[in-house]
Amino acid sequence: MGELPIAPIGRIIKNAGAERVSDDARIALAKVLEEMGEEIASEAVKLAKHAGRKTIKAEDIELARKMFK
């Protein structure tokens, strides 16, 4: 199993309007979010290094997210 707990993932899906959420759906969304998170984080690391920093800032994450779209 991945890094993200599936209970909050189920709440995210329910907040989107679902009445019921299967465990398979929770696990599938968690996997997608982890993959997206890793790609965004990787790009944020590149941005910070390019700026001469070792510390990843929120602005790096936001810019990487915009680039990911």
UniProtKB/Swiss-Prot annotation:
Keywords carried by this UniProt record: Chromosome, Cytoplasm, DNA-binding
Molecular functions (GO terms): double-stranded DNA binding; protein heterodimerization activity; protein homodimerization activity
Stated induction or repression of this protein's expression: Expressed at constant, high levels during exponential growth and during stationary phase.
GO biological process terms held by the UniProt record: DNA topological change
Family in the record: Belongs to the archaeal histone HMF family.
Subunit structure: Homodimer and heterodimer of HmfA and HmfB. Forms primarily homodimers during exponential phase, and heterodimers appear when cells enter stationary phase. Dimers then assemble into higher oligomers, with the DNA wrapped around the protein core.
Protein name listed in UniProt: DNA-binding protein HMf-1
Organism: Methanothermus fervidus
